């Protein structure tokens, strides 16, 4: 196979931290509030601006509360579980590495007596029809390490008594979110917005706030996780008064991303960019003799974390360690040629390729990286078969 001679303009395909919005450079951060307290008037204004712009772009209902929290999406999910659980039985639905992490917390770390853990292997969604609306529920909207997303939220009752916590970190800003079905939604700045790591967002419904004020967990809650003070909802967190000190440089960076999102047409265009990225890969997969989607149901294929695996019988016959090493070499060849970075699948996922297709990735760059994946696979396979 002939080596491609056209490379992506931006070869960054990492699933986090994700590539910056087109046109980004360090000069865009020149107005950052550096050397000033995040609790100063100007500091709080910047933080509140992040909250309000996020609400407007994502079309979050006015009655939902939005807060900036530490430790990225992970911190936001942990905060929700540790503060809200203990009143009702808990169900966790997981099908990728991070969903399995939440299942570990619920099943082994939190002292919960009645927890149901519905786990499936990579590529398959669990059976949501088993859910009980009296229970609290945790799930990821999009399994970032599996490339598998939920089809819809029809399985969530509008008259539920339990709370629904959704880790939506690789879904928001690229997929339409049905807010009324969710009581807690979390995400980070580093995913679809292409901003910096370490900062998370937590969104609470009125029902979640009611739980905070009516239930005190039986376990200690560290300061960094506390969403309530003496059974009173801590509103300050949701008006720019963060629990601990955020990076004001990162705040300026995420404001740039949010302004960029507004400038291109808001949530509708963000979703369209990601959808087009997936359609480009789908068309390529249809003609591929080597690759297929990891997702087994076409309706569940993610448009952000696009995971593909070799279907080549030669590859399937390799030992597991050999498969892992082979795909590392494939991705290494692409990187050596500066045609695509960070394309290797997640360490616990089946060996393959993961292309980030979020809204900061331009469609033409996805088109340009695909021939390099074909070439690198064949190049490395020839080395293996000739040894």
Summary of predicted features, one role per range:
Residues 179-190, 200:
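Conserved active-site segment immediately N-terminal to the catalytic lysine
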Residues 27-79, 83, 97-105, 286:
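Conserved N-terminal alpha-helix of the aminotransferase class I/II PLP-enzyme fold
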Residues 121-173, 184, 192:
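Active-site phosphate-binding strand-loop segment of PLP-dependent enzymes
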Residues 286, 290-364, 368:
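Conserved C-terminal alpha-helix-loop-beta "cap" of PLP-dependent enzymes
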Residues 190-284:
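Active-site C-terminal subdomain of aminotransferase-like
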Residues 1-41:
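N-terminal "arm"/small-domain region of PLP-dependent enzymes with the aminotransferase-like
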Residues 75, 82-137:
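PLP-dependent aminotransferase-like
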């Amino acid at each position: 196979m002939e080596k491609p001679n056209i490379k992506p303009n931006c070869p960054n395909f990492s699933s986090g931290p994700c590539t910056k919005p087109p046109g980004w450079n360090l000069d865009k951060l020149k107005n950052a509030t550096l050397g000033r307290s995040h609790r100063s008037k100007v500091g709080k204004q910047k933080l509140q601006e992040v909250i309000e712009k996020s609400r407007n772009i994502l079309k979050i209902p006015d009655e939902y509360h939005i807060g900036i929290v530490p430790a990225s999406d992970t911190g936001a999910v942990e905060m929700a579980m540790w503060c809200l659980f203990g009143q009702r039985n808990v169900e966790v639905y997981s099908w990728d590495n991070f969903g399995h992490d939440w299942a570990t917390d619920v099943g082994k770390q939190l002292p919960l007596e009645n927890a149901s853990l519905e786990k499936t292997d990579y590529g398959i969604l669990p059976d949501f029809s088993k859910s009980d609306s009296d229970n609290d529920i945790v799930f990821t909207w999009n399994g970032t390490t599996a490339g598998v997303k939920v089809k819809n939220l029809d399985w969530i009752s509008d008259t539920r008594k339990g709370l629904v916590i959704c880790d939506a970190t690789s879904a928001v800003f690229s997929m339409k979110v049905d807010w009324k079905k969710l009581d807690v939604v979390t995400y980070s700045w580093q995913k679809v917005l292409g901003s910096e790591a370490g900062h998370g967002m937590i969104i609470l419904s009125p029902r979640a706030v009611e739980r905070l004020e009516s239930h005190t967990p039986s376990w200690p809650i560290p300061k960094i996780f506390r969403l309530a003070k003496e059974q009173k909802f801590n509103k300050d967190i949701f008006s720019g008064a963060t629990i601990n000190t955020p990076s004001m440089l990162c705040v300026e960076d995420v404001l740039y991303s949010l302004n960029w999102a507004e400038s291109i047409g808001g949530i509708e265009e963000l979703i369209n960019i990601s959808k087009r990225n997936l359609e480009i890969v789908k068309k390529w997969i249809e003609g591929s003799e080597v690759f297929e989607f990891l997702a087994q149901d076409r309706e569940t294929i993610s448009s952000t974390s696009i995971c593909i695996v070799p279907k080549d019988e030669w590859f399937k016959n390799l030992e597991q360690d050999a498969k892992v090493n082979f795909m590392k070499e494939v991705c290494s060849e692409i990187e050596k040629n500066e045609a695509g970075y960070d394309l290797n699948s997640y360490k616990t996922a089946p060996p393959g390729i993961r292309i980030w297709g979020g809204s900061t990735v331009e469609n033409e760059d996805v088109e340009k990286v695909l021939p390099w994946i074909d070439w690198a696979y064949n190049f490395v396979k020839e080395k293996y078969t000739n040894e």
